[in-house]
Amino acid sequence: KKLNKEEWFKRIEGLYHKYNIQLKKFYHILSEVDVYSSGAKLSIQNGYYRPELKEADKSFIECKEIRHPIVEKIHTETEFITNDIELGVQNKKDGVLLFGTNACGKSTFMKSIGLNLIMAQAGLFVAAKEFIYKPYTQIFTRILNNDNIFRSQSSFAVEIQELKSILKRADNNSLVLGDELCSG
């Protein structure tokens, strides 16, 4: 017997309802396989490094030759400058005040740290030569310069309010990334 369109939809709907739980489990497993196989392919193609987890009293990052995984692919006409960073490592600095002339890579470096940390904590390889860390429980960013015209707040007032909120919630296991603070 040849089925018409409506009968096909009813059969498919019936199968979906019958195997709904199994299908959801299958889709979940398939999505994880997709994420990790894509991550593995990118890692091989781009020379990414397997991050190392290390036990410590508080969160930290110690990395060599960190790169921005997106910028290095977009700007292929120039050599990407790598950087080293240690944050929260025992007897070392818990923070860095990064300054320099315009367009020298400060924002890219800061975003490189955040992106690579998120990649590491998601179980992916990272754009660095070495990456040792204890996971952070919170990552706060203050990157965009925004005013709030609905509340009649200047960019500076919004920045101060956001910084206050970040500082209230941050602890030893938080990473705070801020770009061009108090420039409004």
Locate predicted features:
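Switch/coupling sub-region of P-loop NTPases
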Residues: 138-184
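Alpha-helical coupling/stalk and coiled-coil linker elements that connect catalytic or binding modules
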Residues: 1-104, 108-139, 162
